[in-house]
Curated annotation (Swiss-Prot):
The keyword Hydrolase applies. InterPro entries: Acylphosphatase, Acylphosphatase-like_dom, Acylphosphatase-like_dom_sf, Acylphosphatase_CS. It comes from Rhodococcus jostii (strain RHA1). Residues 3-89 form the Acylphosphatase-like domain. The gene is acyP. GO terms for molecular function: acylphosphatase activity. The active site is at R18, N36. Its EC number is 3.6.1.7. This is Acylphosphatase.
Length: 89
């Protein structure tokens, strides 16, 4: 199990982006959250198997999201195991 932190840049607030991300993450069996940041980005924290996390990352970059994603910067770590479900914050 791994943990992915993704900073999503672009027009991603107020357009259903967090809801969409939550739906995709739940379909993949991931846990974590998507949270709006004051600077306009969305922070996505997700834990699960590496292949499922990479699928979510591909979806975030796909161009088929609500709004418009300009850039996704990700960081990988070991899972902490402190998350349950996948929520919007």
């Amino acid at each position: 199990m791994e943990r992915m932190t993704a900073w999503v840049h672009g027009f991603v607030q107020g357009v259903g982006f967090r809801w969409w991300t939550r739906a995709r993450a739940l379909e993949l069996g991931l846990v974590g959250y998507a949270a709006n940041q004051k600077d306009g980005r969305v922070l996505v924290i997700a834990e699960g198997p590496r292949d499922k996390l990479e699928t979510l990352l591909t979806l975030l970059r796909s161009g088929d999201t609500p709004g418009a994603v300009d850039l996704v910067v990700e960081q990988w770590d070991s899972a902490r195991g402190d998350l349950t479900g996948f929520v919007e914050r």
